[in-house]
Structure formats: structure tokens, C-alpha cells
A protein has these predicted regions:
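A late C-terminal transmembrane helix in Major Facilitator Superfamily
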Residues: 326-361
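Cytoplasmic helix-loop-helix junction between adjacent transmembrane helices
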Residues: 100-137
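Juxtamembrane intracellular "pre-TM" segments in multi-pass secondary transporters
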Residues: 181-211
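Helix-to-loop junctions at the C-terminal end of transmembrane segments
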Residues: 58-69, 259-271, 358
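Helix-loop-helix hairpin linking two adjacent transmembrane segments in secondary transporters
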Residues: 134-181
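Conserved MFS/SLC helix-loop-helix module at the cytosolic interface between two early adjacent transmembrane helices
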Residues: 56-95
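Extracytoplasmic gate region of multi-pass secondary transporters
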Residues: 25-27, 206-259
């Protein structure tokens, strides 16, 4: 239990910083737009560059994470991403700003796979599942901290503070993981198969294709929709950027408890994940669709919050239930990398689509697209179940 506590605490703290960095652009978008130096299109380019490099990096670093010691990848990833964010406020050139977010994406892609590998291969299945629930909780604490920093301080300070903490944590995490390795508290399974065979082996793992589709849906929700949340609050609903950040913080707090709700419901319904996903996808589709007819901004916030809560429950089933169950395969980092890569490629494409639609068509069409994401998820669960029956 002591080992699980140390492993869990180290990984969770690292993941909070990870998600602070991942969502900092989203919460600071209204402030950046007010400067007059940033446009929606340029911010979309920044976020999509980050997403694409994160996706590619997840694929590459996911497999490397099953070969090399996670402590090197975790510490180096924090160092690179932190340095990129510290430099960003001081760079006036758009192309170099995009380069900063490219380094941010690739640096952060070095974290999740090795972190999941550390948890899954060094704790019992029950402990791993519980730690990963807190892992998901941490993924919402990061955006919450980012929004609070944005509310209290200027956008420049928020970037510098986030990057500085990441750089400092890169050294702290390396020291902690090194000490635990020397004491024999943690060890890692190294894959013996490399190259194309290693890639193909991932696709032989049970249910991988179904969860690849789920990953696309939850990452579009977590990354693409969340990216434009504060913009939705300021531009579509007319809130000030300060109020928008407060609302964003409130939504993040509520969503942070969804992993615990998911685990409790999952156990209560005897670990039947597919029926649970059908409910969450249905709720999300309906709530997003209600935004089209809503004329009250507070009701719109309620509908959006419920939709995002439902998607967060689905996300928890993927990251807190399915991934930790693969510890004995020795390919946790690889599977995580493939799933996150595909998910973020989908999110990057959706991000550009949403930006184009909201600029040239209107928000109602954006709501329709968001609702369709839930519909696609619902249909996928029935297709997957039908194939299981046929087999």
C-alpha cells in the first residue's frame, strides 16, 4: 500500500501539471483575443499544431516507453514542454509561437504512456484502477488551476508560472523515480519485440479497435470542445472573460468528480461498460442538441455542463478502467500511445473544423456537430455489441 501511495502521488502530481499545460491555451483564449495580436484562426493553428504533435509523439513515445526507463521520458517531457511555455509570451512572431506549441505537444506526449506503465506494472489491479481514477481527477484539476491563474493574473504570468512549475517538476520526478528504482520499489517490463511487430502486437489486444473509436470521441470532447469552452461563454453567451473563467472553473470542479462517479456506477452495474457508455453518449447527444433551442444562457451552461459530465464518465471508462487492466501485457505505454495518438488526430481535425464553422457559419452548426459526436459514440456501441454476438 505504501508503494502504491508513493507511485500514485508522484504520477498524479505530474499529471496535474500536464493538464495545466494542455488546457492553458483554452482558458486564456479570451484574454489573448483581447490583446488584438491573436485571432481565432491563429489560436486554432496553435492548438491544432499542439494536438498533431501530441498525437504523433504519443505514437512514437508510447512504444519507446515500453523500451526505455519511464523516468527519463517523464523528466525530459516535462522539461521540454515547460521551457516551450515559458518562452511563448516573449515571442512576437507567429511562426515561432507555433513552434513553441509543437514542442509543447511533443513534450507532453512523453508523459502519459510512461506514467500509466509505472502505475499498471507496479501496483495491484485494484490499486492501479483507483490511482487511475485519481489520475482522471487530476486531469480536471489541471484546467481548474489554469483558469484560476488566468482569473487572478495576466495571461503572460499564467504561461510563465505553468512552464516554470513543469521545469522544476522535471527534476523532482527524476529524483523520486530514481530513488524508488534503486530501492527496488518499482521495476518495468521491457518489450522484447520491436519494430513493426511491436506495432502490430498492440492491435491484437482485446477490444482495441472499439476503444480506438471511443478515444476519438472522448478526445474531441476533452480537447476540441473544451478548447472553445471559454470562447463559447464569452462570444456566444456574452459573459465577460472574468466570469467565463469562473464558470469554466466551476465546470472543471464538477467534471473532476466524474471519474469517481463512473467507478461507483461501473461497480454497481457489475462492470458492464457498454450499457454505461450507451447512456452517457445518449445524454451528451441530447444535451448538446438542446443548446440549439436554448434561449437562456444559464440553461445553456447547464446543458453544456451535463453533456461534458457525461463525456467525462465515458473518458473515465477508457483511461481508468480499460487501460489499467492491460498491465500484464507489458504494453501499457504502447497501447496508451496508439489510443491517444488516434484520439488526438481526430481532436486536431475537429478543432480546425469547429473554428472554421464558428467563424464562417455560426454557433448552431457547431452545436449540431457536437451532438453528432455523441450519436456516433452511441452507434459504435451497438455495432461493437453486434460483432461480439456474431463471434
Amino acid at each position: 500500500m505504501k508503494k502504491a501511495s508513493v507511485v500514485g502521488t508522484t504520477c498524479i502530481l505530474t499529471y496535474v501539471v500536464n493538464y495545466y499545460l494542455r488546457h492553458i491555451l483554452s482558458v486564456l483564449t479570451p484574454a489573448l483575443l483581447l490583446t488584438g495580436n491573436f485571432t481565432i484562426e491563429h489560436i486554432a493553428n496553435l492548438s491544432s499544431t499542439y494536438m498533431l504533435l501530441y498525437a504523433v509523439g504519443q505514437l512514437v513515445n508510447g512504444f519507446l516507453g515500453d523500451i526505455f526507463s519511464p523516468k527519463y521520458m517523464i523528466s525530459f517531457g516535462l522539461l521540454v514542454s515547460g521551457a516551450a511555455i515559458v518562452l511563448f509570451p516573449f515571442i512576437p512572431w507567429k511562426l515561432l509561437q507555433i513552434v513553441c506549441f509543437a514542442f509543447l505537444g511533443f513534450g507532453l506526449s512523453m508523459l502519459r504512456g510512461p506514467l500509466m506503465k509505472t502505475i499498471s506494472e507496479n501496483t495491484s489491479p485494484n490499486h492501479a484502477r483507483l490511482i487511475c481514477v485519481f489520475f482522471s481527477f487530476a486531469s480536471f484539476c489541471g484546467p481548474l488551476l489554469a483558469s484560476l491563474f488566468a482569473l487572478i493574473n495576466g495571461w503572460n504570468f499564467a504561461f510563465i508560472a505553468a512552464g516554470s512549475v513543469a521545469v522544476a517538476l522535471s527534476f523532482v520526478s527524476y529524483i523520486i523515480l530514481s530513488v524508488m528504482e534503486r530501492k527496488g520499489l518499482i521495476s518495468y517490463m521491457k518489450t522484447k519485440v520491436t519494430g513493426i511487430a511491436s506495432v502490430l502486437a498492440v492491435f491484437k489486444i482485446e477490444n482495441i479497435f472499439f476503444y480506438l473509436v471511443v478515444a476519438c470521441i472522448v478526445e474531441i470532447s476533452a480537447a476540441s470542445i473544451s478548447q472553445w469552452l471559454t470562447t463559447f461563454l464569452t462570444v456566444s453567451l456574452g459573459f465577460s472573460k472574468e466570469t467565463a473563467n469562473m464558470i469554466y472553473s466551476g465546470i472543471s470542479v464538477i467534471r473532476s468528480f466524474m471519474p469517481f462517479v463512473s467507478l461507483a456506477v461501473f461497480r454497481a452495474i457489475k462492470e458492464r461498460d457498454i450499457p454505461m457508455m450507451r447512456v452517457t453518449f445518449s445524454i451528451a447527444a441530447i444535451m448538446f442538441a438542446l443548446l440549439i433551442v436554448s434561449s437562456d444562457k444559464w440553461m445553456s451552461i447547464l446543458f453544456l455542463s451535463i453533456a461534458l459530465m457525461a463525456m467525462s464518465c465515458t473518458s473515465a471508462l477508457l483511461w481508468s478502467i480499460y487501460i489499467p487492466s492491460l498491465g500484464k501485457t507489458g504494453r501499457v505505454s504502447s497501447v496508451n500511445g496508439v489510443i491517444d495518438c488516434i484520439g488526438y488526430i481526430a481532436a486536431a481535425g475537429a478543432n480546425l473544423l469547429f473554428a472554421n464553422v464558428m467563424s464562417n457559419v455560426g454557433w448552431n452548426t457547431v452545436y449540431i456537430l457536437w451532438s453528432l459526436i455523441g450519436v456516433i459514440g452511441l452507434v459504435t456501441t451497438f455495432v461493437f455489441n453486434q460483432r461480439k454476438v456474431q463471434r
